[in-house]
Amino acid sequence: MINDVLKEAEDRMVKAVEALKREYATIRAGRANPNMLDKITVEYYGTQTPVNQLANISVPEPRMLTIQPWDKSSLPMIEKAILKSDLGLNPSSDGTVIRLLIPQLTAERRTEIVKTVKKKAEDSRVAVRNIRRDSNDELKKLEKDHTASEDEVKRAQDDVQKMTDKFVKEIERIMGTKEKEIMEV
């Protein structure tokens, strides 16, 4: 019973950290990264479809993305979706390929992005702490139901705390790396 609670807590904490990594992958850091386009969807045959499912996205140069749609008729729609997105990119098209030149980030924009990065890290820390609280509540319930002894529950709560500390430290590390990447000129 206690092991189930600990395993579930760890699985949920891992998912919280993975979600943060995915979120950070979509944040623009002055370098071309195909993941920047993950959140952009295009109305395609009546369905909102992610750009990465409509085209081949490649990085020919460190500051350029090329988007080559498999269906050429989707090219103008992809272009429009990129313009509407909050990425601040201007697509240029030659009729078969869309080129996205990634401009150098201004100091002001870097600061804004770092604030976003910190907020997302804080949201992840809160999620991990909420998982800790839920796990501790489940452990107390086991003790109350006499399914586990007080000592076992105390030990398990210590394990949950160690786990929480480990994942919060991991979130801090990921945030620091992303922050450094953004502030790099």
Swiss-Prot record:
Pfam family, one: RRF
InterPro entries documented for this protein: Ribosome_recyc_fac, Ribosome_recyc_fac_dom, RRF_sf
Gene Ontology annotations for the cellular component aspect, listed alphabetically: cytoplasm
Localisation per UniProt entry: Cytoplasm
Keywords: Cytoplasm, Protein biosynthesis
SUPFAM superfamilies named among the record's database cross-references: Ribosome recycling factor, RRF (SSF55194)
Entry superkingdom: Bacteria
Coiled-coil regions listed: none
Annotated stretches, region: Disordered: 137-158
Entry annotated with the keyword Calcium: no
One Gene Ontology term from the biological process aspect of the record: translational termination
TM region positions: none
GO molecular function: ribosomal large subunit binding
Family: Belongs to the RRF family.
Its job: Responsible for the release of ribosomes from messenger RNA at the termination of protein biosynthesis. May increase the efficiency of translation by recycling ribosomes from one round of translation to another.
Protein name: Ribosome-recycling factor
